[in-house]
Amino acid sequence: MTPPPDRPRRERPTARTPQRSARPPRRKPLDPARRAAFDVLQAVRERDAYPNLLLPVLLRERGISGRDAAFATELTYGSSRVRGLLDAVIGSAANREPETINPVLLDLLRLGTYQLLRTRVDAHAAVSTTVEQAGIEFDSSRAGFVNAVLRTISTRDEQSWVDELAPDRSVDPVGHAAFVRAHPRWVAQSFVDALGASAGELDAALAADDDRPQVHLAARPGVLTADELAGAVNGDVGRFSPYAVYLPSGDPAQIAAVRDGHALVQDEGSQLVARALTLAPLADDQGRWLDLCAGPGGKTALLAAIAVGSGARVTAVEPAEHRADLVVQNTSGLPVDVLQADGRSTGLEPGFDRVLVDAPCTGLGALRRRPDSRWRRQPADIPALTRLQRELLASAIALTRPGGVVLYATCSPHLAETIGVVGDALRRHPVIALDTRPLFEPVADLGDGPYVQLWPHRHGTDAMFAAALLKLDT
């Protein structure tokens, strides 16, 4: 009889041969930078958190600094900013709609895909770290799915994926530009509509939303000049606003002039809007100025600082308690009265000389400052916002004396929020449009008027819109 084959003998453990655990080895979790980015993406999805607000807190709490902090910032802001493009690539590589993928897995895939397409991270490291985290969060099956998708993505560069997935430029030029620049198509279309005859600038306008915005400071009039502030912070005097200084680097919160209230952090476009109201031609200015949508108080502070020189006093209206408190803090020592109230029903006595309506809006003009905001807003948001804007502008006009000026402003170029709202006011209320362009001198390239539309790619500011209206005597 043929003897049975030898079976491997199991050795008893000895002191020299320790027995191995039957449990699989614990996978190494994500490094601190990737972990922070992953946690922020989950918080955005689950709690509607804002990446630009949450990430600095996490970095500080976890002691992440230097290169790790820079990497976490790049992953978080970058993957948030180009989410639409990443999802299109992920969907193609996975052969399924991104919406059908587990949301946590999709967050991981976005981080991995961003590293593969937009960074110099080694492809193997980008894939392996993401797969390992998928195994920790789920199981080997899900980790295998992540591995397969990322390996497919890693076989091609971004341009190759864009060439395959972007709409045909000759058929849908707006859709093509929106895909390439990672914007929702409706946002790109709103830029085209606002650019009008300059629609050929669409790509430049979209690209500017991906540029890191330079920090702008405003020197407080009557206290500090722009030249003095620039010298103190080693910055450059602004191109347009007489108060503006461009900060090349560093944390503005650490600047002594900012801490002391002698300067504030404010985009140059916002400075120009506040200044424009004070430059509007007005007979017999009695010094009653109103900021109807004041929170958090940046424009109010600049208005009030200018008001000091003319003997005017500013009333600031803000409905939200915490934002009204910020107005109080930001205008300390200035001639400002803060009223917590809805701007549509303030209870104030009419007769204001100059009124600013910096209305709540979609914020499409400041997409470069908030990495995920282009994906937060939807076209369905527009009707409610424009209704609020019309009501606020109507209230402002009612509070303005005959011969007084209202300056309506938004940080959005969307025509429904700009000329649509202003046009409605011109039809319904006793106002006429002034040529707003002279109020923004020395800014050039402002078009045919009578309104002003700033653009990041032209002026280096947020895309602020402004319209000056003169109230008639009825």
Give the label of every model feature segment:
Residues 1-474:
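S-adenosylmethionine
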